[in-house]
Every structure is written in structure tokens, then in C-alpha cells.
Amino acid sequence: MSQLFGDPQLSASDRDLAALQGSWEQVSLEADGISNPPGDLGLRGALTTFRDNHFVVRTTEGALLLEGTFVLDASVSPKAITWTDSMGPDSGKQLPAIYKLEGDLFVFIAADEGASRPSMFRTGPGQTMRTLVRRR
């Protein structure tokens, strides 16, 4: 993106999109109230790379885990993101989520397709939501 993060002409969503660009390391995952569960999506150190509205997730060895697109809406509170995976069991599904960008941390909570978008930054057993924390 050729535009600057602080450009007052940009919408809040465009500024957040610019801030997301590049690579982020996964530092934690909570799924259904379980911290860092086994499985591919719980891999600490997995790298997510954002380019425009496209994302790619790779293991520390470089194997492709997941990819797709996303749409941000920073005009609502909490800020909303909708993920659409292009591979795997959720391929083509729109996954409602919320996010926050705090310095070098990107935190988001995603629900399953058809579920309500999360409304707070907290998950627990039986909620079928995932909290992911990524760091630059």
C-alpha cells in the first residue's frame, strides 16, 4: 500500500488494513476455552502474512496451513473482521470475528459461520469461538 498509516483522508478500516500488512507470528490460541489446543491452527510460531485483503498462514517450516481473504469494518465497536478461507474445512464460509490492533499485537476472536459475531474479547467452553493472538 502506498498510503500512510496516519493519513487523515483514510477511513479507520483503511488505516487498520495498512497496519496489518506484513508478517505476524502466532503466540497463542484459545479454542472453546482450551489454551493452545493440539492441531494445525494451534501451532505457536505459525506465520500469517497479510497482503492487501489476502492472508496466508504457514508453519514455522513453511508448509501452507490456510489462506483466504478478509474484510475489516473499524467503524463499529468492537471492530469487525470477516474471514473467508479459500481452502480447508471452512473454504468459502464467512467467519464473523472481532479484532483489535494494539502496537505489535493483533488479537481476534472468530466464530463459526452462521453464528453471531462475538461482542467481547472473551471466550469460554461451549462457545465454538477461537481467540488468536499474533505478534509482529
Label every model-predicted segment.
Residues Q26-G39, N53-M120:
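Contiguous, well-ordered beta-strand patches that form the walls/edges
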Residues L4-A12, F70-L72, P78, E113-R136:
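Edge beta-strand at a domain terminus
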Residues Q9-E25:
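N-terminal helix-cap/turn-to-beta initiation motif at the start of protein domains
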Residues F50:
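N-terminal beta-hairpin/loop module of FHA
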Residues L41-R44, P125:
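A short beta-loop-beta micro-motif enriched in histidine and acidic residues
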